[in-house]
Amino acid sequence: MNQIILDLQIACVDNQGLPNENDFQLWLSSAISPFKKNAEVTIRLVDEIESRQLNFQYRQIDKPTNVLSFPFISPVQVPLPLLGDLIICRQIVEKEAVLQKKALWAHWAHMVVHGALHLLGYDHILNDDAKKMESIETEIMMYLGYPNPYD
């Protein structure tokens, strides 16, 4: 049986109107369980200030972003289920949903799925890699009952 453990941290000043822990657990498990049987992931929901600080500190980009992924690199001799951390900026997710005319919960789900795939080693730097990652994201989103996030 798969065991995907979620540590949800809410660091937003206003925590009203956020998806609940069950939502995040479903989205995370749906993204990870096809690839790993056991994993632990922290999802930290933040405001724009913290997102901007982390984005600058780790990527030298001085603005907030929707999701940051920090994969955990396990020492070779120590098999741990820790997969990594996702930092998701509430305000950016909400703004993007409006600008892209997407249902808010669908966009939250997409950010979790997208970030989880980064933790699993997928990226979208090269065009072929982007196509593969987007295809997997779309499949997971449709499994969850959401539309293709790239349409």
Curated annotation (Swiss-Prot):
InterPro entries per UniProt: MetalPrtase_cat_dom_sf_prd (IPR023091), YbeY (IPR002036), YbeY_CS (IPR020549)
Keyword field: Cytoplasm, Endonuclease, Hydrolase, Metal-binding, Nuclease, Ribosome biogenesis, rRNA processing, Zinc
List of residues binding Zn(2+): H114, H118, H124
Cofactor info, note text: Binds 1 zinc ion.
Gene Ontology molecular function: metalloendopeptidase activity; RNA endonuclease activity; zinc ion binding
Assigned EC number: 3.1.-.-
Cofactor(s) required for function per UniProt: Zn(2+)
Cell compartments where the protein resides: Cytoplasm
Main localisation: cytoplasm
Ranges in a coiled coil: none
Superkingdom of this protein's organism: Bacteria
GO CC, alphabetical: cytoplasm
GO-annotated biological processes: rRNA processing
Alphabetical list of HAMAP family matching this protein: Endoribonucl_YbeY
Physiological role: Single strand-specific metallo-endoribonuclease involved in late-stage 70S ribosome quality control and in maturation of the 3' terminus of the 16S rRNA.
Family that this chain belongs to: Belongs to the endoribonuclease YbeY family.
Record's protein name: Endoribonuclease YbeY
Protein's organism: Hamiltonella defensa subsp. Acyrthosiphon pisum (strain 5AT)
Name of encoding gene: ybeY
